[in-house]
């Protein structure tokens, strides 16, 4: 947050008082500082002061006696000295504005700290809006400025627009998320519409800048339409008309109402009245008169254009002529079943379903039943206009239901009649609003059901068509699949036969191969046996030929032939054969 500096200026009636005050301030200890002391432009010394702030000026100083060498220690002494007769002004160092050409289009870019509440109903007072709806915490801690604008454009209705400038962008974002779409009250279906202000574009200055030598500059500068400033200048802080304290948007929130008077937010909250504390401007009275004037000029039947015996539908606002004319109001009921209609001239409410008047029905506090109020009291006429709350109910309810009147006298009589029976009228307003709300919800539910039924029927028809198409596609696909299945089955049978033949051949060949392997093995064994026998026979013949002439000892000897280690079994078998041969000999 930026740090600001303030300047105190003392304005006196003559030069002697200025010099005297200056000498007094020079003698003050360094603890007390005065930024500037001077004489403002005064036409004459004997000029009559026109400012309510003019008074006798005195300065209080604290004298320290603790450093004195006295036995008894004295406390600090507060002394006062008269300066003169004048005004104390408090200035704030602010940034100077850049000179702009009024003929050119000016664009003031936003900094995401400004939001706007659109279409605030006219029955909301400033106190209700700030204190009850927005809340004291937001008003006192987050908001720097409020500005309330009234809409008087034809066709847009009579309502208010509230500009709110926050101290930082995060608070503005949180405010928009919390209040956008929030209902203004339980009995009013209207909701709060909060938008962010991106920039402000205008062709001329919104307010005329005050001259540098004027005593009361207008609100320092307008926080909603002034760019960021660069040069520092002195600007006097204005005072709040309610509490007479200085108004600074950096320390407390400020609110500007439609009559362009500015106050502290907490001061206006304490002023529980719809009128301005300065000029007594009442937004409710002006909006009501404007609404009645606009409605009286444009009241006519929506079908035939008749201006006599008009009835307005309380459900949708349709205006039609009565049963003594072309009966367009009754036809509207027969077409839409909107059973409540109000006579624009007398403000009486007729129930087409019950075929009777219901504008005098209130809710009994004992058992909650609807009872009819009879008779009229003779209350004092001085009660008219004394209660802002009743004016809010009467005028706000009439402006909301779009009533139309051509005579101010009849309007006054109607208002007097409402205020004579204030309790009954409050009950009537609550009951009527609740009944209308239930009617609105009922018919909205019926319309939603009708739309849902129509959409469901169209969806069913489309689903039926798609179902038929899918059935045809399924039948075609099923036939193709059956053909493919038969072909695949025949092919599968052929393949199975081939596989069975191949498997039989494979088994036969396997058996034949095993038989051949066994025969081959037997032949190998017989071959080896025959080879050994031939070898033994050849050895026997050779040895017999060699040893035929030898001695008996040599003939009876044994011949050993060394064989490899791996052929042990073969040698054993050979020995057995040799023994067998010898035994045979």
Curated annotation (Swiss-Prot):
GO CC terms, sorted: cytoplasm
GO biological process, any: response to ethanol
Binding site for Zn(2+) 1: 301, 304, 321, 328
Biased composition annotated in UniProt, kind: Basic and acidic residues: 400-410
Segments passing through the bilayer: none
Location of the protein in the cell: Cytoplasm
Residues annotated as binding Zn(2+) 2: 313, 316, 332, 338
RING-type zinc finger locations on the chain: 240-280
Region (Disordered): 372-410, 552-585
Record key words, sorted: Cytoplasm, Isopeptide bond, Metal-binding, Phosphoprotein, Ubl conjugation, Zinc, Zinc-finger
Job of this protein: May act as a cytoplasmic retention protein with a role in regulating nuclear transport. Binds nuclear localization sequences in vitro. Needed to adapt efficiently to ethanol, either as sole carbon source or as cell stressor. Involved in ethanol-dependent transcriptional activation of several genes and ethanol-induced protein turnover of some proteins.
Name used for this protein in its record: RING finger protein ETP1
Origin species: Saccharomyces cerevisiae (strain ATCC 204508 / S288c) (Baker's yeast)
Gene symbol of the encoding locus: ETP1
